[in-house]
Amino acid sequence: MTRFIFITGGVVSSLGKGLASAALGALLQARGYKVRLRKLDPYLNVDPGTMSPTQHGEVFVTDDGAETDLDLGHYERFTGVSARRSDNVTTGRIYSDVIARERRGDYLGKTVQVIPHVTDAIKEFATADLTDEDFVLCEIGGTVGDIESLPFLEAIRQLRNEMGAERSLIIHLTLLPYIPSAGELKTKPTQHSVKELLGLGIQPDLLMCRSDRPIPEAERNKISLFCNVRREAVIPALDVDTIYQVPVSYHAQGLDVQVCRHFHLPMNEDLDLTRWQTIVDRVRHPEGEVTIAVVGKYTSLIDSYKSLAEALVHGGIANAVKVKLVWLDSEIFEREDAVHYLEGVNGILVPGGFGERGSEGKIEAARFARERSVPYFGICFGMQMAVIEFARHVAGLPGASSSEFGVPEVPLVGLMTEWVRGNERVARGSGDDLGGTMRLGAYECHLRALSKVREIYGAEVIHERHRHRYEVNVTFKDQLEEKGLAFSGMSPDGVLPEIVELPDHPWFIGVQFHPELKSKPFDPHPLFTSFVQAAITQSRLV
């Protein structure tokens, strides 16, 4: 029997519902249960693929090619369960589905309404595509009281009535602000948030109260009294110094125990969270430190590179060092000399991105790394800019550029018009829609024997996740290799360059895919582990 846990939020946004869901999933896994986590987003975009990273944060891509919310990255990193397209839905996707059904005549002439048609579609999503999971955790995006969230909250109210308390649990995450002038935590915002939820017909079973300090018993009792929940079900969600402390902290506060008691499940009181504590200890007590510059164009919001930042943390954990990140806007290097900003770093990483803005700055960062023998890691757009830099300054192609920026003299990077997905050929054109038309999801890549990446992966064939519509032009492969740039990873048909490297450089690798999406604290991605190791070596040479 699959049990459902719905996680809502109140008072303010960005309280950490995604991390709370991921941490609870990890705790239930530690108790031997199989879990799946889902995110219901109340915005009208069909998916976040066309949303600005500086508004929404990164787009997390799944193996099956879905562009999803960054919280699915937390779910994967904490539980190790690969997310699927069916694990993220938006209001836009729900409405598109309902309207398509209406056009087909599926509703047989009925007046299509939010209730029951939209809410039924939401319920179908929440309960579909399941196998033998013990728990499904559904996070409801947004904040209680937002007009956009109402159909989703109504849907979970109906699901609760249909399933009963035996199969469903509702958790409400809220905020207890501290008022310095009063010298106390205030419970009134939480009371009003729960009142708003009750007005929608939903009684939460557990309250998770975010706070930057311990919550006195008097406040917990007060919340219990006015919000109509048991005192034991008022769970402190205290701030921690690393997100990997969250499962340990929530277990200490009894979150997983209360969930199991709600469902009348047997419990092993000696829950082993040793591996989580080991990760926390390594983060808190590193044996050294390296500095890595991330040269990007969306650095005004670090969540634009959430998986990237976490993957570098994982690489640091694997090497027992702290990775200090220096976030640099690539446009700076189009106005100023890169030396001033980069001469003190131990590694340079240029992540993915879109458009011409800041591209020349990324090219300058790649040039600095190549000429100064500083470890360089180019991801997606960062690989393309590294290849353009090499072509201009080493291979004698000063007009090399990308067709993404116009009509270049030397079209070194161009729009992919077709590629193979499984056994099918996919075709695209320059006039196609932007949403959902990129090369998305996991693809196979063959690694060249005796290459650095072959040594790093320890495998001949790998599968990595992609999100791009431009690719290095394979017709220039021989010309660039003659000058020393190795194309060490290719698509199975040999048409799409996936990895380049400089064999004579200490560590210079560019990849067309996004390895950060598959890195986990207990299974760091080998490229990030190796990159941080190279940064350690470089730090000893300075």
From Swiss-Prot:
Positions of CTP binding: 13, 146-148, 186-191, 222
Keyword ATP-binding: yes
Involved pathway(s): Pyrimidine metabolism; CTP biosynthesis via de novo pathway; CTP from UDP: step 2/2
EC identifiers of the protein: 6.3.4.2
GO BP terms in the entry: 'de novo' CTP biosynthetic process; pyrimidine nucleobase biosynthetic process
Amino-acid positions noted as binding ATP in the UniProt annotation, renumbered to this chain: 14-19, 71
Catalytic residue list: 380, 514, 516
Primary enzyme class: ligase
UniProt cross-references to Pfam families, sorted A to Z: CTP_synth_N (PF06418), GATase (PF00117)
Record's keyword annotation contains Nucleotide-binding: yes
Activity control summary: Allosterically activated by GTP, when glutamine is the substrate; GTP has no effect on the reaction when ammonia is the substrate. The allosteric effector GTP functions by stabilizing the protein conformation that binds the tetrahedral intermediate(s) formed during glutamine hydrolysis. Inhibited by the product CTP, via allosteric rather than competitive inhibition.
Domain Glutamine amidotransferase type-1, first and last residues per copy: 291-541
Source domain of life: Bacteria
Residues annotated to bind UTP: 13, 186-191, 222
Binding site for L-glutamine: 353, 381-384, 404, 469
Residue sites binding Mg(2+) per the record: 71, 139
Keywords of the record: ATP-binding, Glutamine amidotransferase, Ligase, Magnesium, Metal-binding, Nucleotide-binding, Pyrimidine biosynthesis
Family: Belongs to the CTP synthase family.
Protein name: CTP synthase
